[in-house]
Amino acid sequence: MNSDLNKLQPYPFERLAALKAGIAAPEHFNAINLAIGEPKHVPPHFIAEELLAHLHGLANYPTTKGSLALRCAIRDWLLMRFKLPANSLDPEQHILPVNGTREALFAFAQCVINRGQPALVLMPNPFYQIYEGAALLAGAEPYFLNTTEATQGLPDFDTVPEAVWQQCQLLYLCSPGNPTGAVIDADTLQKLIRYAEQYDFIIASDECYSEIYFDESNPPMGLLEAAAHAGNTDFKRCIVFHSLSKRSNLPGMRSGFVAGDAEIISAFLQYRTYQGCSMAPYTQAASIKAWGDELHVQENRRLYQQKFTAVVDILSATMDVRLPDASFYLWPKTPVDDAVFTRELFAQYNVNVLPGSYLSRDAHGVNPGHQHIRIALVAPIEECIEAAHRICKLNEQFKK
């Protein structure tokens, strides 16, 4: 058995289940689940039609590389969304479809980490737990970059010691962030690209929340966009991960892509020829339609905007909470230990949220998730509003 498996910590939702074990939630309150970031808005109507229309593809093995039509659709979306130079992306060299970004983010570390020398993988803290597991099982050590109120919910890259950069082989970014919703600006991204060149590491930017934002005239900056603005139109050392799960409310379809540096994409394709699972032909067909349509994405943003406006207005009366730059999470402070608050919210009010400390690690003398909860505004607006009122009631109880 791989001894590195012993380094993995229980997944946050496993810990949440243990926290609630043996507790019977009050039945006079309807259950409201805001713990998991699973979109609940209605998927685009045309997706089911495309899936059904292409079921004949079940008779064929799909290629690891995916169809040229899908890669072209992804190319067109990237050019449009991030205003990239027209000829900067070749669908044959720069793009690789994947079955959702979860497995791709994990597999990527296995592909690029050189086990022959000491390796650090830098990542935000709190963080999407796949980053840590990927680093550990690739034989590397995670190095956590705390995101706190003092750093506006972003990693403070200026405090990273020179010796850490020298051992860095991979930097995971998450922008917009999970759970803070903070967006990394162009200057910072371009500085990190320079660091990647100077210290010889790869940047893996998880941008799965990039299409959930509030200002239609100011969408979040992407890594490839920042690279192109800096003249790095070959996207050297830059890889981005995108998904239809959040953008198009299709978490069950498992469709995303990896794009960027052609040399790295070529190596990742070779790796995935052995390890990865090819995307089903009917999923590819539906994905082409999804990447080609923006109307449903705009409607998605409108629905989240409504929920954020209503919920932040309610919670701000009793909690320290702010509207994030983007994503569908709130990250408020709690008056007591976050696990205690989460347990009592379920026990007394039948509302599920996630303790912030379950998403973070003790690092540099603090746990940045302590006394925070992550609220995923994925439920219908009526449930989100009701949950906000219940959260306020519990908050007031603890403040007495």
Regions found by a protein language model. Give the residues of each.
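Glycine-rich loop-to-alpha-helix module at the N-terminal edge of alpha/beta enzyme cores
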Residues: L34, L58-Y61, A73-D76
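PLP-dependent class I/II
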Residues: N2-P12, G22-L52, A69, L79, ...
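A short, structured active-site edge motif that brings together acidic residues
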Residues: Y61-S67
